[in-house]
């Protein structure tokens, strides 16, 4: 009976610690109601208008919530497009005290993204670069704790290999437009290499990988 009471006490202490740490994390988030209202209005005003390689609002919310939950502060986006995903990412980073580096090779998309970031009130949280990600990603020093890859699928694996050493343990690497073969997805070697990438990341023992609709989410558990 004494052992049972002791075990119950330990469990209660552990649960209390988890709850307390969760409350502390929530308190640590930066509160900016005016910015939140501005971003929400921007997203509402532009709902259904995002085209040109942008993600859905659902996927944007997924990225936002991952960053908040992990308290991530150093983010990289490969493939800005016109900025929809970057807005969701930067919005979360505005709450954690972080900053986003985002890169796109297309000058017109880059220009439009800059305007969208400004209108959403998030420019100060974003370092948007017009560059070839094939070269820039290799040059970036990091470290990063969050990555969103949404560029050329046949380069997905190369991007991952280049960033992996720069991703912190506990960090999250997300990739867009990935589907499980069992769900009628791309399969090995299909759709420009995304199938090969999917199989590669799933095989890594130091990553825990799951699929949320079309977003592959990989958490780094250890260096090797």
What do the predicted segments below correspond to?
Residues 4-5, 20-146, 153-224:
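A short alpha-helical cap/connector motif
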Residues 8-18:
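Bacterial N-terminal signal peptides
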């Amino acid at each position: 009976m004494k052992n049972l009471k002791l075990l119950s006490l330990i469990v209660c202490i552990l649960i209390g610690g988890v709850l307390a740490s969760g409350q502390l994390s929530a308190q640590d988030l930066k509160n900016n109601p005016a910015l939140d209202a501005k971003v929400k209005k921007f997203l509402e005003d532009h709902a259904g208008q995002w085209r040109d390689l942008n993600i859905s609002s659902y996927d944007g919310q997924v990225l936002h919530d991952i960053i908040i939950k992990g308290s991530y502060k150093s983010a990289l986006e490969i493939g800005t497009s016109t900025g929809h995903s970057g807005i969701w990412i930067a919005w979360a980073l505005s709450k954690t005290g972080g900053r986003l580096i985002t890169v796109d090779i297309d000058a017109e998309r880059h220009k439009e993204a800059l305007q969208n970031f400004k209108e959403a009130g998030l420019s100060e949280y974003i370092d948007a670069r017009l560059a070839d990600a094939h070269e820039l990603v290799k040059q970036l020093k990091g470290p990063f704790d969050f990555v969103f890859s949404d560029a050329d699928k046949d380069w997905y694996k190369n991007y991952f290999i280049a960033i992996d050493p720069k991703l912190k343990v506990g960090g999250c690497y997300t990739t867009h437009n990935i589907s499980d073969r069992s769900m009628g997805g791309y399969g090995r070697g299909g759709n420009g290499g995304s199938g090969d990438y999917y199989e590669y990341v799933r095989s890594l023992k130091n990553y825990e990988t799951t699929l949320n609709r079309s977003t592959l989410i990989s958490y780094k558990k250890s260096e090797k």
